[in-house]
């Protein structure tokens, strides 16, 4: 296990080493952000089974260590995350604990604003850090895409971004599509939007199906279909919802984590050889209380867990300066205390993913919070 001090200090030499300049960013590399909306419980995902307070505070919510997927003598993955556990063993996943953004209150709306804009406080910044990341790369069409019904804040900004969400309706036939295209030809705005929509549909291809609601694995394959194309996007965001588990958490989280595992598996299968150049960040707006509540769930907390997954990831490690779960160690007598800034993790991962200067990347993505300047390299060279 690597602690925060090692994570931060080991890159002092890295900053002194020559870096590839901004204009030379490797655009065949791919970066995907999977957001867990609703405050995913990091203690239920990456389980600190060896902490003596864990089982006592979690009660019936505690995962039996005999069933958990043990990674070392301290942490285990939830038993639903078999695919991610395999990627960890293969050196293609790194796991981070006690992670938090600068936000310290407990509003989903405000916390997601901070997470997606890269600000220090809600509404300090108007555009999203992923859009600013796209602006650091050599310009190309179809540079970034959101897999969501509407464009998420993280991808809003000066750079044009596509969005795609599978429809529950049957596919329109080619004749109807042609008629609509002719109808919109005289309108500069609608014509452009329609062309973008048709291009997105074409990129989705046969994997999109047309049978309504897609499974997580199918969605992963559709997203991979976009990303794997030579002319496809290189930055993508996938929204997942349903992580706000105030009640019946044990069964709900088992389902949520199974879906996440299948989504990652779909991405890996669909990307094929492009998986080797792919980095996936999984993160949430904040964590949940250490102790279970009275309705079989947990309430809004502070620190949580995050993941970096992909063929490009220099994985097989857990990064955690573990604060402990004893009463004296908790934040506000209830929350896992954060020891690693999510902005530090994101900035370094993005710099590594696209071979950008780490200091400049941190300044562009997180201009107000000033994340730590250095860390060990997270991705393969």
Each predicted region: which residue ranges?
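Feature for exported/extracytoplasmic and membrane-associated proteins, marking the mature portion
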Residues: 1-273, 291, 305-381
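Metal-dependent active-site segment of extracytoplasmic phospho-/sulfohydrolases and closely related
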Residues: 264, 268-295, 300
């Amino acid at each position: 296990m690597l602690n925060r001090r090692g994570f931060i200090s080991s890159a002092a030499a890295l900053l002194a080493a020559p870096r590839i300049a901004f204009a030379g960013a490797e655009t065949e590399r791919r970066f995907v952000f999977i957001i867990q909306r609703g405050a995913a419980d990091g203690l239920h995902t990456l389980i600190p089974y060896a902490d003596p307070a864990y089982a006592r505070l979690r009660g019936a919510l505690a995962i039996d260590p005999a069933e958990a997927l043990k990674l070392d003598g301290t942490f285990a993955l939830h038993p639903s995350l078999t695919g991610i556990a395999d990627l960890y063993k293969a050196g293609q996943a790194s796991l981070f604990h006690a992670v938090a953004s600068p936000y310290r209150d407990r509003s989903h709306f405000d916390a997601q604003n901070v997470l997606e804009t890269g600000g220090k406080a809600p509404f300090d910044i108007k555009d999203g850090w992923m859009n600013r990341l796209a602006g650091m790369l050599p310009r190309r069409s179809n540079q970034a895409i959101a897999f969501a019904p509407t464009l998420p804040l993280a991808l809003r900004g000066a750079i044009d971004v596509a969005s795609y969400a599978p429809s529950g309706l049957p596919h329109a036939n080619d004749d109807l599509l042609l008629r609509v295209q002719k109808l919109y030809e005289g309108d500069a705005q609608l014509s452009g939007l329609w062309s973008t929509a048709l291009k997105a549909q074409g990129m989705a291809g046969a994997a999109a199906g047309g049978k309504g609601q897609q499974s997580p694995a199918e969605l992963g394959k559709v997203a991979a279909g976009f990303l794997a194309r030579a002319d496809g996007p290189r930055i993508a965001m996938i929204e997942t919802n349903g992580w706000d588990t105030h009640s019946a958490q044990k069964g709900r989280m088992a389902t949520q984590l199974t879906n996440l595992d299948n989504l990652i598996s779909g991405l890996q299968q669909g990307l094929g050889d492009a998986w080797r150049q792919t980095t996936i960040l999984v993160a949430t707006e904040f964590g949940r209380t250490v102790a279970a509540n009275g309705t079989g769930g947990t309430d809004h907390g502070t620190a949580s867990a995050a993941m970096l997954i992909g063929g490009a990831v220099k994985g097989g490690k857990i990064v955690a300066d573990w604060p402990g779960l004893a009463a004296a160690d908790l934040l506000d007598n209830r929350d896992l205390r954060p020891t690693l800034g999510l902005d530090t993790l994101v900035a370094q991962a993005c710099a590594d993913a696209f071979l950008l200067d780490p200091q400049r990347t941190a300044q562009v993505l997180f201009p107000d919070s000033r994340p730590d300047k250095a860390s060990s390299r997270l991705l393969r060279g």
